[in-house]
From Swiss-Prot:
CDD domains: PK_ILK. ANK repeats lie at residues 2-30, 31-63, 64-96, 97-129, 130-174. One of its GO terms (molecular function) is protein kinase activity. It comes from Homo sapiens. Residues 33-139 are annotated as: Interaction with LIMS1. This is Scaffold protein ILK. Changing R225A: Reduced interaction with PARVA. Decreased focal adhesion assembly and reduced cell migration. Scaffold protein which mediates protein-protein interactions during a range of cellular events including focal adhesion assembly, cell adhesion and cell migration. Regulates integrin-mediated signal transduction by contributing to inside-out integrin activation. Residues 180-212 are annotated as: PH-like. One of its GO terms (cellular component) is lamellipodium. The modification Phosphothreonine is found at T173.
């Protein structure tokens, strides 16, 4: 079968590029052994494919069934250029697999001397023990062993044995490839959905946690008055565009159930354990969003929006705000396609005006530059990330809409905010929509801020 895993193994860059260009393909899916496309390309030394996968957003620290990361495989097989590429993109150099081995264990065992030296030069620990009490240097032949010890000591490493603990990876979440079959089903049998817990209910419908084909999912049941053949046809036509699997910062709609046979039109999407960015910032989840995490979220959102803005035509009726951005298990922010409104859902109503650009509150959608308006929404998200506050929390939606559109109400930037973030916010919130930047222009700015 000439699938993506074979193409990555064989280094067929043209076929891989064509596959990546199809938005319904998920580059972070896994095969039967939990190997992602990146695992295979790293194992087989396919540098061009590795580069392409990383540029398209492949997860660097993804683990297969044996908890090997792509770095474990590249180090074992002595692909020095790929090891350096993975390290450049922040691969976890001391990631532990199911045997307690780190990439350096394998580089030493297989006699990949140069790779072992590179790993130590980048902070790999020479005396971390696996489950069997063996250190990486125990696996190396004598000359390499001495050399690595010497290098590590020069770099300030303590050469005493670090005993194996089952908690080496605690505090990081183990990132698994996604189930590769999920993007194959667009129409879903309503009877196969198992509704577990109701999460939320509002004007547009109900949100449930559920199970489907052994996977945790979120089920969105739409409330639609006077369901008709025409609305049913629109639902069928508009759904497929929301199945975007090809970008790591976009959360696709996995599939839909038409009504009938379902009692209401229904969407399903991946379960996100942390919920939305709104939940994380304002509803006390278990982790702290510090400055570096805030910049990472901003970068994730900017990358996702930059991708969505390349689509022609644009996805209509998509509103960017902190409730429509989901946070994945590995703290990646993803723009949710399940929050896009359908043409038959309350046209002309705004439910989150605090994030909406003034011109979009005043004009019809067809008279607004959507890309510029999205940039304003992004500026409000930046404000929210640095202040941890809900914009205009003391006003009703009606008041916010009126005051932003007609009275010049704007978020006030408090003192003490990083001057870089402050400047970026002001640029993105320019009163003249034509002077706001595009997302592909601010991605490199945020990347620089992240590196600092």
């Amino acid at each position: 079968m000439d699938d993506i895993f074979t193409q990555c193994r064989e280094g067929n860059a043209v076929a891989v590029r064509l596959w990546l260009d199809n938005t319904e393909n998920d580059l972070n899916q896994g095969d039967d052994h939990g190997f992602s496309p990146l695992h295979w390309a790293c194992r087989e030394g396919r540098s061009a494919v590795v580069e392409m996968l990383i540029m398209r957003g492949a997860r660097i620290n993804v683990m297969n069934r044996g908890d090997d990361t792509p770095l474990h495989l590249a180090a074992s097989h002595g692909h020095r250029d790929i090891v350096q590429k993975l390290l450049q993109y922040k691969a976890d150099i001391n990631a532990v697999n199911e045997h307690g081995n780190v990439p350096l264990h394998y580089a030493c065992f297989w006699g990949q001397d140069q790779v072992a030296e590179d790993l130590v030069a980048n902070g790999a620990l020479v005396s971390i023990c696996n489950k069997y009490g063996e250190m990486p240097v125990d696996k190396a032949k004598a000359p390499l062993r001495e050399l690595l010890r010497e290098r590590a000591e020069k770099m300030g490493q303590n050469l005493n044995r670090i005993p194996y603990k089952d908690t080496f990876w605690k505090g990081t979440t183990r990132t698994r490839p996604r189930n590769g079959t999920l993007n194959k089903h667009s129409g879903i049998d309503f009877k196969q959905l198992n509704f577990l817990t109701k999460l939320n209910e509002n004007h547009s419908g109900e949100l449930w946690k559920g199970r489907w084909q052994g996977n945790d999912i979120v089920v969105k049941v739409l409330k639609v008055r006077d369901w008709s053949t025409r609305k049913s046809r629109d639902f069928n036509e508009e759904c497929p565009r929301l199945r975007i699997f090809s970008h790591p910062n976009v959360l696709p709609v996995l599939g839909a159930c038409q009504s009938p046979p379902a009692p209401h039109p229904t969407l399903i999407t991946h379960w996100m354990p942390y919920g939305s960015l709104y939940n994380v910032l304002h509803e006390g989840t278990n982790f702290v969003v510090d400055q570096s995490q805030a910049v990472k979220f901003a970068l994730d959102m900017a990358r996702g929006m930059a991708f969505l803005h390349t689509l022609e035509p644009l996805i209509p009726r998509h509103a960017l705000n902190s409730r429509s951005v989901m946070i994945d298990e590995d703290m990646t922010a993803r723009i949710s396609m399940a929050d896009v409104k359908f043409s038959f859902q309350c046209p002309g109503r705004m439910y989150a005006p605090a994030w909406v650009a003034p011109e979009a509150l005043q004009k019809k959608p067809e008279d607004t530059n959507r890309r510029s308006a999205d940039m304003w929404s992004f500026a409000v998200l930046l404000w929210e990330l640095v202040t941890r506050e809900v914009p205009f929390a003391d006003l009703s939606n009606m008041e916010i809409g009126m005051k932003v559109a007609l009275e010049g109400l704007r978020p006030t930037i408090p003192p003490g905010i990083s001057p870089h973030v402050c400047k970026l916010m002001k640029i993105c919130m320019n009163e003249d929509p034509a002077k706001r930047p595009k997302f592909d222009m601010i991605v490199p700015i945020l990347e620089k801020m992240q590196d600092k």
